[in-house]
């Protein structure tokens, strides 16, 4: 047990990668608080893990909800050693040309409020506890934080923003809090899309990612969600990762070394925009 006696707060921890992280961190001996919007899934977590998990219903877009989560984690477990801002939505690779003008502002706000502001809120709310424990923050990024075509412009821009956030906060919070990021790859999960684009009930598990990634990734398959959790355990383990801050870990099956399949992503733009030169 690498994390025995540690206290962890995870946002978006009731499904997908977040759920796998909860399971792994509990297995490593940690106590885990989870902020999530689904009361039903939080209840399942508490049933499965008993006193090792505290479920907190809330919205990551609300600073007050994030502060309540931090307060309840400290009240229950005495501290916060590791914060994992993880809640997010995906834009289902909706290209700029396909974004409806009437929905663009709302979609931008929704993606950035959850995927970026929600992360900033989490750190702001937990900062006193993290400084007190000489703790660490591990941001869930995505391969879209490093390469194009891991999403549309909204998702890709949001994830690139998190890369900048890792670097800035690693500087601002040193030497008291370490800040790192994990750029995971495709996951078969319940990850939803923006409600403002009519994708609020659409899950990424409906996309045939396994077949797509099998021919793209150098490792020849899509990793199982549980396989991503080891990187987070590494960064959270004080004895193993004490020198690590500002680190960005590409953890996506080798996507960055696969080479390019096409030099241009806009080969169909003329047809899409009905332009006839």
Curated annotation (Swiss-Prot):
It is an enzyme of class 1 (oxidoreductase). NAD(+) binds at residues 9-36, 59, 159. Its EC number is 1.3.1.56. It comes from the Bacteria. It catalyses: (2R,3S)-3-phenylcyclohexa-3,5-diene-1,2-diol + NAD(+) = biphenyl-2,3-diol + NADH + H(+). One of its GO terms (biological process) is catabolic process. Gene3D superfamilies: NAD(P)-binding Rossmann-like Domain (3.40.50.720). Keywords: Aromatic hydrocarbons catabolism, NAD, Oxidoreductase. CDD domains: BphB-like_SDR_c. GO terms for molecular function: cis-2,3-dihydrobiphenyl-2,3-diol dehydrogenase activity; oxidoreductase activity, acting on NAD(P)H, oxygen as acceptor. Pathway: Xenobiotic degradation; biphenyl degradation; 2-hydroxy-2,4-pentadienoate and benzoate from biphenyl: step 2/4. The active site is at residue 155. Substrate binds at residue 142. Belongs to the short-chain dehydrogenases/reductases (SDR) family. PANTHER family: BENZIL REDUCTASE, CHAIN DEHYDROGENASE, PUTATIVE (AFU_ORTHOLOGUE AFUA_4G08710)-RELATED. This is Cis-2,3-dihydrobiphenyl-2,3-diol dehydrogenase. The gene is bphB.
């Amino acid at each position: 047990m690498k994390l025995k006696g540690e206290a962890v707060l995870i946002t978006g921890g009731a499904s997908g990668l977040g759920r796998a992280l909860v399971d792994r961190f509990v297995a490593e001996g940690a106590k885990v608080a989870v902020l999530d919007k689904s009361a039903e899934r939080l209840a399942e977590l508490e049933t499965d893990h008993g006193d090792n998990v505290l479920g907190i219903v809330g919205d990551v877009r609300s600073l007050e909800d994030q502060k309540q989560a931090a307060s309840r984690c400290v009240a229950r477990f005495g501290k916060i050693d590791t914060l994992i801002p993880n809640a997010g939505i995906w834009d289902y690779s909706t290209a700029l040309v396909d974004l409806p003008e009437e929905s663009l502002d709302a979609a931008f706000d929704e993606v950035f409020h959850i995927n970026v502001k929600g992360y900033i809120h989490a750190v702001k709310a937990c900062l006193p506890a993290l400084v007190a424990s000489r703790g660490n923050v591990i941001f869930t990024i995505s391969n879209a934080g490093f390469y194009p075509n891991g999403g549309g412009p909204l998702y890709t821009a949001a994830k690139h923003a998190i890369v900048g956030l890792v670097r800035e906060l690693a500087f601002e919070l040193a030497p008291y809090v370490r800040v790192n990021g994990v750029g995971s790859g495709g996951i078969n999960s319940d990850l939803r899309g923006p409600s403002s684009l009519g994708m609020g009930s659409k899950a990424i598990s409906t996309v045939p990612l396994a077949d797509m990634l099998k021919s793209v990734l150098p490792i020849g398959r899509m990793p199982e969600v549980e396989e991503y959790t080891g990187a987070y355990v590494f960064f959270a383990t004080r004895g193993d990762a004490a020198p690590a801050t500002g680190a960005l870990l590409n953890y996506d099956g080798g996507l960055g070394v696969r080479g390019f399949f096409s030099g241009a992503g806009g080969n169909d733009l003329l047809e899409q925009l009905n332009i006839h030169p």
